[in-house]
Amino acid sequence: MADTNPIKQFEVHEVFPFEAFGLNLAFTNSSYFMVLTTVLTIVLFMVAMSSRALVPNRAQSVAEIIYGFVADMVRSTAGQEGLRFFPFVFTLFIFILVANMLGMFPYFPAPGAHSFTITSHLIVTVALAMLVWLTVIIYGVFKNGFGFLKLFVPSGVPIFVLPLVVVIEIISFVSRPLSHSVRLFANMLAGHILLKVFAGFVVTLAAAWGGFGYLAGIAPLAMAVSLTALEFLVAFLQAYVFAMLTCIYLNDALHPGH
């Protein structure tokens, strides 16, 4: 019978074992899907934009729509000045979106013959969130100097509560990588577990009850199909939310004064 353990899909397996200087540097299924996500994204956009026709074909139209969508998001959130970060935000959005979508396919030409959702691992989302956080700090200090500290001193706050507000602002800023990463990780993890659980119901009922089990499995199968459609939407929304929050945080580096 098929393995219905909902957690097994998140296991990291070594594909090519490698060790150097006492460190395990093995190429894993997680590494494979990171590379695949990067290569697939580059290839798709190269193919889509190869013609650069005045009247775009479907692939070019999709690429231009995505480009415009992200550009509008950056402009509306971080202002015209924020467009200097467009390549950064666009790369994050596309990488997360493609990674999320790849994880939606149960079987894939990959090690172990099944897909792997890299954004369902906290270490990956934390790395992405830390990249954003450090970018905000480095650019904010570089552009504003000590003026970057205005971020922690909101204007118009009464002096007698200002110390408390400053502490709250600092805690909020320091905790950004955690909230930024956990939101993406938790949504992708929970969604894939639910899909696996309902799909497992169908397999278990069919194996245990035979023909009657197939009839009993119609309800969980319908739920699994509905959840799959919802999960595709969540995959897009989580990429959008991560990119949107990135724009908001970058706006703090550009304009630290409240």
From Swiss-Prot:
Transmembrane segments: 30-50, 85-105, 122-142, 151-171, 198-218, 230-250
Source organism superkingdom: Bacteria
UniProtKB keywords: ATP synthesis, Cell inner membrane, Cell membrane, CF(0), Hydrogen ion transport, Ion transport, Membrane, Transmembrane, Transmembrane helix, Transport
InterPro entries: ATP_synth_F0_asu (IPR000568), ATP_synth_F0_asu_AS (IPR023011), ATP_synth_F0_asu_bact/mt (IPR045083), F0_ATP_A_sf (IPR035908)
One protein family per Pfam: ATP-synt_A
GO molecular function list: proton-transporting ATP synthase activity, rotational mechanism
Chief site of localization: membrane
Any Gene Ontology CC annotation: proton-transporting ATP synthase complex
Membrane topology summary: Multi-pass membrane protein
Localization (cell): Cell inner membrane
Keyword Magnesium: no
Keyword Zinc-finger set for record: no
Known partners and oligomeric status: F-type ATPases have 2 components, CF(1) - the catalytic core - and CF(0) - the membrane proton channel. CF(1) has five subunits: alpha(3), beta(3), gamma(1), delta(1), epsilon(1). CF(0) has three main subunits: a(1), b(2) and c(9-12). The alpha and beta chains form an alternating ring which encloses part of the gamma chain. CF(1) is attached to CF(0) by a central stalk formed by the gamma and epsilon chains, while a peripheral stalk is formed by the delta and b chains.
NCBIfam families registered for this protein in UniProt: ATP_synt_6_or_A, PRK05815.2-4
Role noted for this protein: Key component of the proton channel; it plays a direct role in the translocation of protons across the membrane.
HAMAP family per UniProt: ATP_synth_a_bact (MF_01393)
UniProt record similarity statement: Belongs to the ATPase A chain family.
Protein's name according to its UniProt entry: ATP synthase subunit a
Gene coding for it: atpB
